[in-house]
């Protein structure tokens, strides 16, 4: 059997679309703001 190669890594996911990554840029902060306004339970990944 061959291995599943398309697993995805948690570290990369957090680094690209985690909370601190979002807060780093102005547009990312807009994303957080919009999700707060909408009432999302999960702001980021």
UniProtKB/Swiss-Prot annotation:
One of its GO terms (cellular component) is ribosome. Belongs to the bacterial ribosomal protein bL34 family. The gene is rpmH. GO terms for biological process: translation. GO terms for molecular function: structural constituent of ribosome. It comes from the Bacteria. Residues 1-45 are annotated as: Disordered. InterPro entries: Ribosomal_bL34. This is Large ribosomal subunit protein bL34. Residues 11-25, 33-45 have a biased composition (Basic residues). It holds the Pfam family Ribosomal_L34. Keywords: Ribonucleoprotein, Ribosomal protein. NCBIfam families: rpmH_bact (TIGR01030).
């Amino acid at each position: 059997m061959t291995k599943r190669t398309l697993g995805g890594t948690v570290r990369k996911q957090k680094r690209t679309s985690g909370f601190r990554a979002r807060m780093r840029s102005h547009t990312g902060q807009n994303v957080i703001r919009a999700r707060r306004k909408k009432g999302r339970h999960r702001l980021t990944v």
